[in-house]
């Protein structure tokens, strides 16, 4: 198994872990002025988001700025919080170098979103994934 940390190592924020060059676990941002984003632009086959905080989901729409449209797997509350915070990021930084995604990218998120409940296994990029309640915030998940 190949694991690459694209952010979130030795820092709090911009969590992004690429597994076997195909499964991306989280794709967050480090809030600040200017905000910082993961160090690479991966091209995953699927994305799994653990919870909706900016440091874990804040850069997810940027994954949809190119031609590929990987499915984004998350719980329903995580999806709603992540989309709401992305809308807020666009209001604050949209159209500037401080925001790596556009309104079109955010619209695409809804088109590739796949919501899952706890304890329901699902396939993602050749892996079987199951969410378990992490108890951090509503919808947060341990990802196994």
Feature map (PLM): residue ranges:
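Pre-active-site segment of Zn-dependent metallo-hydrolases
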Residues: 9-14, 18-70, 74-113
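Alpha-helix-centered segments that form part of catalytic cores
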Residues: 106-126
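Catalytic core of the metallo-beta-lactamase
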Residues: 1-4, 18, 120-144
